[in-house]
């Protein structure tokens, strides 16, 4: 099974944690690390300590909020430093639909990169803009989005 570690600015990670628990229940393979404004080095220590608790997994997919942000950069540093001991992949642009898909599919994939690659179309498809269709007043069905 793939382990998941979520990190982002402010309470991004714990906010997603509460939403994920509400939608999918407790996910034992998923850990959350917030970046509350401490130094980048302190965040790196927190992420490293969390990764240390996840060594039983086949690999770890780290899900962060912003590409190039401190949680992303420190996770990439740890990926490179631990390449010989732990398989770690790092992904940015995380949102709730992506996390939900990762959590429900983490047991299907053997490598975190395979899970990450499978999630890219899911992430893109989760972004939608509501458009009111005109010309069909009899159709009051708003689909699954309302």
Annotated model-derived regions:
Residues 1-146:
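N-terminal loops that bind phosphate or other acidic moieties
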């Amino acid at each position: 099974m793939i382990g998941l570690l979520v990190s982002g600015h402010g309470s991004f990670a714990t906010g997603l944690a509460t939403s994920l628990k509400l939608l999918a229940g407790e996910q034992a393979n998923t850990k959350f690390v917030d970046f509350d404004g401490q130094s980048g080095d302190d965040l790196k220590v927190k992420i490293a300590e969390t990764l240390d608790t996840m060594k039983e997994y086949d690999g770890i997919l780290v899900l962060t909020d912003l590409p190039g942000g401190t949680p992303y950069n420190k996770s990439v540093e740890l990926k490179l430093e631990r390449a010989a001991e732990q398989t770690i992949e790092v992904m940015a642009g995380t949102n709730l639909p992506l996390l939900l898909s990762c959590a429900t599919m983490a047991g299907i994939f053997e490598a975190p990169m395979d899970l990450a690659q499978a999630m890219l179309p899911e992430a893109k498809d989760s972004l939608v803009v509501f458009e009111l269709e005109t010309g069909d007043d009899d159709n009051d069905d708003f689909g699954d989005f309302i």
